[in-house]
Amino acid sequence: MKVAGFDWDDGNWPKCGKHGVSRAEIEQVLLGEPVVMADPHPGEPRMRAIGRTEAGRYVFLVFMFRTINSQIRLRPISARYMHQKEIDHYEQQKQVHALAAQ
């Protein structure tokens, strides 16, 4: 799937930014190598992502794919810095994936 960019507006940015995570950090995580899984939200198909920023901060994100003018864009729904338990899970998943790739 080719993603053309991000879908930011006055609806999603305030919700993402209220926990102190910047747009740049959110984009770094989603463009990096996050662990991505389905989100159980009942109303619309959403995804969860956990990953690290270039500065090494761990971020938890909820996002969805939006088609705008025939282009697929990532629309962040919410973002926050991860708790230690989530960081431990993320690092464990990275190790499992690294071993599987060998």
Each language-model region and where it sits:
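Ribonuclease/tRNase effector modules and their secretory precursors
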Residues: 1-102
